[in-house]
């Protein structure tokens, strides 16, 4: 009987003493160590992705706001697409750094002081952030229910809770505060809007709901179940290009008078592609102005700023936009849904859940209800989570968006560059997974079937596509689970599996699973370089095991 993969792993660890090369984090410095005495500092060379050192320092200072990275032997965390780490101002853990001048970039002190705006829009406060440490503060001194009591503490809690609605409204620049509905996250929001539309909008069997293979299960399964149970509506899938972007011309041809809903992710949680949202919405609305466009912004909200009024002026505003707080530095269990007021007024939507906080009067046989948004927020909400979500948005708002995008994509380009340097012809960069005709496609980075090590990545940036710093990688020589297990031994966190996007893997990439690296602005170049080294080293080792007959 062949030994299991786990047995081989244990054996290799003992023989090779593999753990002698791991990621270390000290309190005052970040370094990559082959042993405590030897450190590999990041160095820039010709041909490498480059960014000004001052920009790197900006984000290293912002990283200081995150208590997670202050712990001893802190992991190198590359799973921010699953959930982000939380800053101290959100969760209520004190940080030792208190002076604002620590965030002033050296670039701001050069002869060209306006070359870069500071990523933090500094206030007159002597502290880095005017926002208190909300989660702890609320539960320790402000804990009261909202929309119920008339005593001061309850009124204060209600005021803080409703202020977040205004914060989100201003952040996405929508028309009205009552267009913002608090949810427990994107899954809740998608189930809520799915239920409402299936009740009021989808009336016939031929009514169409358009999705893509790129969607998270939360944007597929609710539609499938509602269509099956209510026996009305039908699901259609929007064609994709081989690069993973929506084929807008073919989408336009498919939109007709039966099209009722188009529900898409702005950013894929596996590929990281940023869809051309304005062009997609315009194409839909030009063919059917009554079609309802839903945008899953779970992966995009932390990286992209939305201006819904501007989009509305250009006839490319989504009717619904949904996001999860924990994906943009807020606590778990909170999120929001933007629901256009004209839509609510036209269809008189009914809520998914019934209970308290949503009624005006209750009779023996029927009740009268509040107006939106309270109509859709039944029961006791996650008050502390919502208030902390407002603090997280204020935190993000202080970071310069253009600088953030440049830095994150610099980290992404660095990762791809170093993978290429370490693996050479063994790195296969695919511009796509499935061709438009349905056959296999892909580009090759020059790898041959006889190469000792092959690692595939889907890199749409290679063809000029816009994306956020998410990189899927896999091999036909070893399992992504083995890769991630070995990385975990090295104190590195990335994810493996289908990433709640089974259709994308099966129908587009045509693989059973993959590993995923998702970067965020608190990651550092040193971490990324170490990650690339370890992925390459482990990939070569696992490929060698496979060639030796170990499976």
Swiss-Prot record:
Positions annotated as active site in the UniProt record: 500 (cysteine persulfide intermediate)
InterPro entries: Aminotrans_V_dom, PyrdxlP-dep_Trfase, PyrdxlP-dep_Trfase_major, PyrdxlP-dep_Trfase_small
Residue ranges of coiled coil: none
Keyword terms: Apicoplast, Plastid, Pyridoxal phosphate, Signal, Transferase
Location(s), subcellular: Plastid, Apicoplast
Location (main, coarse): plastid
GO molecular function term, any single one: transferase activity
Reactions catalysed, as given in the entry: (sulfur carrier)-H + L-cysteine = (sulfur carrier)-SH + L-alanine
Enzyme Commission (EC) number: 2.8.1.7
Residues making up the signal peptide according to the UniProt record: 1-22
Cofactor(s) annotated in UniProt: pyridoxal 5'-phosphate
A Pfam match: Aminotran_5
Entry annotated with the keyword Signal: yes
Source organism superkingdom: Eukaryota
GO cellular component, one term: apicoplast
Quaternary context: Monomer. Interacts with SufE; interaction enhances cysteine desulfurase activity of SufS.
PANTHER family (alphabetical): CYSTEINE DESULFURASE, CYSTEINE DESULFURASE 1, CHLOROPLASTIC
Protein name: Cysteine desulfurase SufS
Lineage: Eukaryota, Sar, Alveolata, Apicomplexa, Aconoidasida
């Amino acid at each position: 009987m062949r030994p299991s993969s786990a047995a081989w792993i244990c054996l290799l660890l003992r023989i090779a003493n593999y753990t002698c090369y791991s990621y270390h984090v000290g309190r005052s410095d970040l370094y990559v160590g082959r042993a405590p005495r030897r450190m590999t500092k990041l160095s820039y060379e010709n041909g490498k992705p480059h960014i000004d050192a001052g920009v790197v320092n900006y984000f290293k200072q912002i990283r200081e706001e995150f208590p997670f990275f202050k712990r001893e032997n802190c992991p190198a965390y590359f799973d921010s697409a699953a959930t982000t780490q939380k800053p101290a101002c959100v969760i209520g853990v004190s940080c030792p750094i208190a002076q604002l001048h620590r965030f002033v970039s050296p670039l701001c002190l050069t002869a060209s002081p306006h070359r870069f705006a500071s990523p933090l829009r500094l206030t007159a406060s002597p502290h880095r952030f005017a926002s208190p440490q909300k989660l702890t503060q609320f539960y320790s001194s402000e804990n009261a229910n909202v929309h119920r009591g008339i005593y001061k503490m309850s009124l204060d809690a209600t005021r803080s809770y409703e202020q977040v609605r205004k914060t989100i409204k201003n952040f996405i620049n929508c028309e009205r505060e009552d267009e913002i509905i608090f949810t427990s996250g994107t899954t809740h929001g998608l189930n809520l809007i799915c239920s409402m539309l299936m009740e009021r909008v989808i009336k016939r069997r031929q009514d169409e709901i358009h999705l893509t293979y790129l969607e998270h299960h939360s944007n597929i399964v609710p539609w499938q179940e509602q269509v099956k149970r209510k026996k009305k509506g039908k699901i259609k899938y929007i064609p994709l290009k081989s690069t993973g972007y929506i084929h807008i011309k073919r989408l336009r041809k498919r939109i007709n008078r039966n099209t009722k809903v188009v529900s898409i992710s702005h950013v894929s949680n596996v590929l990281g592609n940023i869809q051309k949202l304005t062009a997609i919405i315009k194409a839909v609305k030009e063919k059917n102005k009554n079609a309802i466009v839903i945008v899953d912004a779970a992966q995009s909200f932390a990286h992209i700023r939305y201006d819904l009024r501007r989009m509305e002026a250009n006839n490319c505003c989504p009717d619904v936009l949904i996001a999860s707080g924990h994906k943009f530095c807020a606590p778990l269990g909170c999120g929001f849904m933007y629901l256009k007021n004209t839509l609510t007024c036209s269809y008189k939507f009914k809520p998914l859940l019934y209970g308290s906080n949503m009624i005006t009067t209750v009779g023996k046989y029927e009740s009268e209800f509040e107006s939106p948004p309270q109509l859709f927020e039944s029961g006791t909400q996650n008050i502390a989570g919502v208030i902390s979500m407002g603090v997280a948005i204020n935190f993000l708002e202080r970071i310069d968006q253009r600088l953030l995008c440049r830095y994150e994509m610099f980290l992404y380009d660095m990762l791809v560059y170093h993978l290429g340097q370490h693996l050479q012809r063994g790195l296969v960069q695919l511009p796509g997974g499935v061709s438009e005709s349905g056959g296999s496609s892909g580009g090759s980075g020059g790898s041959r079937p006889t190469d000792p090590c092959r690692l595939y990545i889907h890199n749409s940036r290679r063809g000029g596509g816009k994306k956020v710093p998410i990189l899927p990688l896999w091999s036909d020589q070893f399992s992504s689970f083995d890769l991630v297990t070995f990385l975990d031994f090295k104190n590195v966190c990335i994810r493996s599996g289908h990433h709640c996007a089974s259709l994308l893997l099966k129908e587009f990439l045509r693989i059973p699973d993959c590993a995923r690296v998702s970067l965020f602005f608190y990651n550092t170049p040193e971490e990324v370089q170490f990650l690339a080294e370890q992925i390459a080293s482990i990939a070569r080792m696992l490929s060698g095991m496979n060639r030796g007959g170990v499976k």
